């Protein structure tokens, strides 16, 4: 992080929620670019007592609300709405947060046969074979637990979505 990129994003803000994540998203908005270093640069000690794991400001609900707030400012999301991959609890929670930000939900994609053809929060649930065919202009958001993220990425890629462009694995 450079001083210029830090200042361009407005620095840290004191508000409820994950301040580091908020800063990174504002840096991204202001034009900063991120990359993965080819090798580990530090060793991180992660204990259960760390604030990230124990303070309400860093709870999953705050992380999701921060993600929804920034996703709702993306021009493509504003113009085209979203489809959420995952109609379970995580997807429904993200949908509610996006609706509160006035983002149009076009529907859900799910792999569970019993859900396909039904609705979640009043929006249609389509199967994986419909991905890329239903509401293709909408931005795809991966809203599943950690164990299923790779499968959503593979499915999105096979349907022609590009991560960071028209697909975001946001949960």
Where are these regions (language model features)?
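Conserved nucleotide-sugar donor-binding
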Residues: 1-9
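Hydrophobic, well-ordered beta-alpha structural blocks that scaffold small-molecule cofactor pockets
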Residues: 20, 37, 43-171
């Amino acid at each position: 992080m450079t001083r210029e990129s830090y200042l361009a994003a407005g620095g840290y803000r004191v508000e409820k929620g994950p301040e580091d994540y908020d800063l990174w998203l504002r840096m991204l908005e202001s034009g900063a670019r991120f990359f993965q270093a080819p090798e580990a640069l530090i060793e991180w000690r992660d204990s259960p007592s760390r604030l990230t794991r124990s303070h309400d400001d860093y709870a999953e609900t705050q992380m999701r609300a921060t993600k929804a707030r920034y996703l709702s400012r993306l021009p493509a999301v504003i113009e085209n709405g979203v489809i959420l991959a995952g109609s379970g609890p995580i997807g429904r929670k993200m949908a509610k947060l996006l609706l509160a930000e006035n983002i149009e939900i076009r529907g859900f994609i799910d792999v569970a046969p019993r859900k396909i053809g039904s609705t979640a929060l009043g929006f249609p649930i389509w199967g994986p074979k419909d991905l890329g065919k239903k509401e293709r202009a909408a931005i795809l958001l991966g809203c599943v637990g950690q164990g299923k993220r790779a499968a959503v990425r593979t499915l999105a890629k096979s349907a022609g979505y590009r991560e960071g462009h028209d697909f975001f694995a946001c949960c």
